Amino acid sequence: MRIAVEGCCHGELDKIYAALAHLERVEHVKVDLLICCGDFQAVRNVDDLECMSVPDKYKELGTFHRYYSGEVRAPVPTLFIGGNHEASNYLWELYYGGFVAPDVYYLGHSGVVKFGDLRIGGLSGIFKGNDYRKGHYERPPYTHGGEVKSAYHVRQFDVEKLKSVAEPLDVFLSHDWPRGISRYGDQAELIRKKRFLADELRDNSLGSPPAEELLHALKPRYWFSAHLHVKFAAMVRHGDERCTRFLALDKCLPRRDFMQVIDLPDKSAAGGFTLDREWLSVLRANHARHSVTRKPASAPNSAPSSIAEHRTWVERNVSDEALKPPEFVKTIEPHDAANERRRPGQGTAPRGVERNPQTVRLMEMLALDFKLDLDPGGGGGVRGGNGGGGANNFQNNFRAPPPPQHQGQGGDWTGEGGGIQRYPIPREGPFTLVPRQARGAPPPPPPPRKADDNEINLDDL
C-alpha cells in the first residue's frame, strides 16, 4: 500500500488532488489512500461557514462542496480528522465518523477505522485545558459563550476511549502535536523555521498533553500531525523496542512541504474502509457515559473485562458485511453557484442538529440510543471553569520518558524529501533514518521578536 499524508487542507481539495495527479503523471507514483491531518473544512454552503471559527474576511467556500454535491468525485479514497477550523455543525452530525462525501471519510471526534488491513486511529480538534473535562454541550448555531471555538476543543472522554485500544495501531492522527515531540527531532532547526515557538519549545508547553499520553500509550508505527504549518520529523523509541515515526506537515500552498508519500509494502488496500471491531466495542462500553451537556462525562469504562464483554456482543451481532461503513447521504443542499447570491460571511447558521442517516444506522447496529441532538441545557456542573473544567484545575501528571541522547538531532526519518516545484511532494518511501548524531549544544536564544504576518497566535486557536 502507498499512502499520501497531507497537512492542513484549508478547503483546497482540488489543489491537493491535482498534486496527486501530477505525482502519478510525472513520477508514476500512484497512491491508494490520502490522509489529511485537519482543518479539512467540509463546507457545503455559505451557512456552514457560520459554524466555522474564522473571521468573516477569511471565510471562503473552498472546493469541498463540489465533492459533496457529486459534481466531482474524489479520485482517491480520502480520510481526515478535524482541526480548529471546521464546519463544526457537519462534523458533529458524524461524531462517530462517516462519509462527508463519496469516498471522503471523517474519522470522527475520536476513532479507529481500517483501510484494507491498515489500522488507523485519530483524535480531532486541539487541546485547551479550559474545556478538556467538559461534556460535548455545543450545538448549532454556536452563538453562546464562544461555542464556535470550544466545539473543536478535545475532550477527555474521547481521549480516554482511545486509551482503551489494546490492539496495535499502524497510524495515528492528531491535528496539534503531542507535547514534547520536538525533543525527538531537530529542535534547533524547528526554531530556525518558527522562531516564535522558541519559548514554548524550551519550557515544553508546546503541543497537546493528552496527545503526548496517547503517543506513549498506543505506540503506533506512524503519527501524523499538522496545525503549525511546518514540516517536522521525529523518531520516538519506546522502551519495549517499538518506535513511532512522527511527521508534521505544512498547509497546501505552492513550494511548501505539505505532502509526503509513504510506502507500506506489508499492507494491502483491498477492501477499502471498514469499521473496527475493537473500536465498536469501546463505543458500546462507553456510550452511557457520554455527556452531551456541560457536565463532565463519567469516567470512561476502560476495564479489559468490560471491553471484552462488549467485544463478544459485537462478534455475535455485527457481521463482516455490516462492517462496511454506511453509505454517504446528503443532509442539506450544497452550494449552488448559479443561484446563490449570498457571499461567504452572509450565511445563516443552522439551528439544531441534523440526524445524519449514517449515524442513525450506526447507533441502530450497536443497539444504542441517539444522543447528538439532546438538549444540552440543564447539565450544570461546569461553568466558567468550575466543576473541573477550568484551566487552573486541569492536571496532567503524565511524564513521558526522556528521549535518548542521540534523538535530539537525529529524528528526520523522511530522507531528503525531494520536491515538485509547484506541489513540493517528497519522493516515495520507504524512508530511513539519517545517521545518528550526538546531542549538540542548546540552540542560542532567538533574536528580538518582530511583527510577522505569518505568525500563529496560539492563544487564538
Predicted regions mapped to residue ranges:
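Extended recognition/assembly regions associated with phosphoester-bond processing machinery
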Residues: 1-461
